[in-house]
Design a protein with these regions (language model features):
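Walker A/P-loop nucleotide-binding motif
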Residues: 2-14
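Walker B catalytic acidic pair
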Residues: 86-88, 128
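Conserved small/polar residues in nucleotide/adenosyl-binding loops
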Residues: 258-259
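P-loop (Walker A) phosphate-binding loop of NTP-binding proteins
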Residues: 7, 35, 229
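Loop/turn-to-beta-strand initiation segments
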Residues: 29, 79-82, 118-123
Length: 260
């Protein structure tokens, strides 16, 4: 297996595009996958190739006689194929009792599916600075030691130099500064640089509603993200957006209430 890791702006996207084109030139097939539908859509957009969610590709639903609802591991019918998985940091190996997908351990199932055919290879791409799956300290899919436990050799390529928007992007500049603090175990709160960059605007509280509304109008709700430090604050923001921007003041009703 090959693991390609790197922080934002280090060229992972460019490397993946070049890799896919090179494999195509050598007449080697590729299958692109990602853990979520959104990640698969992004992967497909920048490679201009079809991309699937991992679940859609590796599982199939049981027939009615076997018990409709559960999904079992699909047979890998590909030959001499590279399976390229983006956003691999999100792949969990935590078993869930209520899971209807395979063993319930996605990483186990992914590796078993790919290596049903010895001519197939797996490439995992991701950012180790991103949060690991829920209830896990490290991302198992980007942990070389854990991957080697499956019995194969893991080659790793780590991209460390920021190549994209180093000077132009304040978001990338601040993210890199925070990451360096974490790597060096520095204590205290980070100091964010905001005035030197054109892609960062400081918004006063009194102007926040208008700023969010303008972003919704210009970019759309799906492309506007609000990040806050706690679930409590997130709930407050969501309620405020519903009431003051989307004009949905009614309370959310549960399905049981809707049936009354």
């Amino acid at each position: 297996a090959l693991m390609i890791t790197g922080y934002a702006g280090t060229g992972k996207t460019t490397a993946v595009k070049a890799l896919i084109n090179t494999l195509y030139d050598f007449k080697i097939n590729t299958v692109l996958m990602a853990p979520t539908g959104r990640a698969a859509k992004v992967l497909s957009s920048y490679t201009r190739k079809p991309a699937f969610t991992i679940h859609k590709k590796i599982y199939r639903q049981k027939s009615a006689k076997d018990g409709l609802g559960d999904f079992v591991l699909e047979k890998n019918l590909h030959h001499r194929t590279f399976f390229i998985v983006d956003e691999a940091s999100m792949i969990s190996n935590q078993s869930f009792d209520m899971s209807v997908f395979g063993s319930g351990r996605l990483l186990d199932d992914l590796i078993e599916y790919v290596y049903q055919n010895a001519s197939c290879k797996l490439i995992l791409i991701g950012d180790t600075a991103q949060l690991p799956p829920v209830k896990m300290d490290l991302s198992p899919a980007l942990n070389p030691g854990q991957l080697e436990g499956y019995g194969f050799t893991v080659k790793r390529s780590f991209l460390s130099d920021i190549l994209r928007q180093t000077r132009e992007s304040g978001i990338l500049y601040n993210a890199t500064s925070i990451r360096k603090m974490i790597d060096q175990d520095e204590s205290g709160y980070p100091k964010l640089a905001v005035s030197e960059f054109s892609d960062i605007d400081t918004v006063l509280g009194a102007d926040l509603v208008e700023a969010i509304s303008d972003a919704y109008d210009q970019y759309g709700i799906e492309e506007t993200v609000i990040i806050t430090r706690s679930n409590k604050r997130a709930n407050q923001f969501n309620q405020g957006i519903r009431n003051q921007i989307l004009w949905r003041e009614e309370e959310l009703a549960t399905r049981s209430e809707e049936r009354r």
